[in-house]
Amino acid sequence: MKYLDLAFANPAHNLACDEALLELIETGQVKDEILRVWEPAQYFVVLGHANARRAEVNLFACKEDRITILRRMSGGGAVLQGPGCFNYSLVLNGAAHRFRTVREGFRHVLERHRNMIQTLTGFEVALEGISDLAIGARKFSGNAQYRKSRALLIHGTFLLDFDLSLIGRYLQLPSKQPAYRQNRSHLEFLTKLPVRSAELRERLQESWSARTALDKIPIDRIDMLVQQRYGGKEWSEKF
């Protein structure tokens, strides 16, 4: 597996990068699977592909604080990105025959991450709902996926040294909730991992045997996707 540690200053470029990496494997330009990690330097909101802005986001607070609202290609709920939110992206090949269902794809990734975090922290980690990792029924990792015919993108977050109090300012309670949430507030529902980002990077590389640097970074395609989709209101405000 190839490894890429790359964060862009422009939030939209970080979303476009995942799609561009997915295209590399889907089109056969890169044969190896890819692990990317990145950490944002600023706060911004990311909607799931089908999320309605008004239902999921406090638009007034975001406007008042100049928080950018973007939309990703994958499903799932809205998230607040920012310092202390550690992101990973896995681009896997052979999606059509290896992972026939969305649940199979998540289980392949999240069971490995569950074992990794249990070993790292000593805490009992549970796979909750279809795509969450939690400790004591409090979520620390949310994940989403996007499937193409030959490749699969699974990406997600780990809450590390993140200011959880900000989530309730910028995000509404989600319109769709897993049963284990039980309508709890963001502060009651979420927790942070007592792990340093450098340590998590190392463990992810070990878990996925991702030691060789990706030397084909599709910068031009990333720029094009920002111009055509991720950087525009037509995409981010479509719902």
Model-predicted segments: where are they?
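Active-site loop/lid in soluble adenylation, ligation, and acyl-transfer enzymes
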Residues: M1-E56, F60, E64, R72, ...
